[in-house]
């Protein structure tokens, strides 16, 4: 029996190195795991730095675009006003203008100006007599006794203007007071 035990021990000792060798061949050592982890960390840091640089470049380009937009926002409107200025200068160069030709020139210039306003979404606020006072668009300059409903427009002193839907200048109005 001793011989059998001895053979079993020898067989076990022979199997152990083979099994241990096979296990070590498939399982990475701690040093290999550390090296792989360090490589992964380096790759992730590189990816992070590239993403950070890309975001910073995007932010910088967006800021430059906003700055450019602010700088040249009025360019289109200014181009529309140049013919108006040209018309006024030509009117001043006429040596002996007649009242009729001056009136015609002013009307044409006003049409050019209105076209520029319309194209750039600059809208007039001209309340009519009897319109309800709108504090978002009208500024009451005075209250006057009138034969109409209280808090309604009696007279428009000066037109107001909107750019798109934003108030540029309120219309100045006189308002009917309560009786």
UniProtKB/Swiss-Prot annotation:
GO terms for molecular function: adenyl-nucleotide exchange factor activity; protein homodimerization activity; protein-folding chaperone binding; unfolded protein binding. It comes from Janthinobacterium sp. (strain Marseille). This is Protein GrpE. Pfam families: GrpE. Keywords: Chaperone, Cytoplasm, Stress response. PROSITE patterns: GRPE (PS01071). It comes from the Bacteria. Homodimer.
């Amino acid at each position: 029996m001793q011989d059998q035990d001895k053979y079993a021990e020898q067989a076990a000792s022979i199997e152990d190195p083979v099994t241990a060798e096979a296990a070590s061949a498939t399982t990475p050592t701690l040093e290999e795991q550390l090296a792989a982890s360090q490589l992964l960390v380096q790759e992730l840091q590189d990816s992070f730095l590239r993403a950070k640089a890309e975001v910073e470049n995007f932010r910088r380009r967006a800021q430059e675009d906003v700055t450019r937009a602010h700088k040249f926002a009025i360019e289109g409107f200014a181009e529309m006003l140049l013919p108006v200025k040209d018309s006024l200068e030509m009117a001043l160069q006429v040596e002996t203008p007649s009242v009729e030709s001056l009136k015609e020139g002013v009307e044409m210039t006003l049409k050019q100006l209105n076209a520029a306003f319309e194209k750039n979404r600059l809208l007039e606020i001209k309340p009519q007599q009897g319109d309800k006072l709108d504090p978002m668009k009208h500024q009451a300059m005075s209250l006057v006794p009138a034969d109409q409903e209280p808090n309604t427009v009696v007279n428009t002193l000066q037109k107001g203007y909107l750019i798109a839907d934003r108030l540029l200048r309120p219309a100045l109005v006189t308002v009917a007071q309560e009786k």
